């Protein structure tokens, strides 16, 4: 009985430590696109299916990074960083890209530009990308 209890305790500890490491790995992956000089102070988010996000790490500068891997119209590996002020534009991009058809996405972007509903980027902001067939 003591062996079973010890085994279960060990399994719980290992499981808990694995879960605790997952956010760190997500943060590290998202930060791959960030310039080294901005990396330590960057905010890291994780996009949700409803185009809102959870903050994985609060930063001290204006840079925000996130993983786009697995999202429609993205490379097999895709991470991106930009200004916090651009998050509404990113959310709009994600909504348009969710249909998974580049031609339809472009048509939606063009229509939003034409009718004035396209979210403007922060003037002078930069977008950093790291993407490709694998990490």
Predicted regions and their residues:
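Intrinsic disorder/low-complexity segments
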Residues: 17-19
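Positively charged n-region of N-terminal signal peptides that target proteins for export
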Residues: 1-4
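Bacterial N-terminal signal peptides
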Residues: 7-15
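Primary mode marks residue(s) on the alpha4-beta5-alpha5 output face of response regulator receiver
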Residues: 21-135
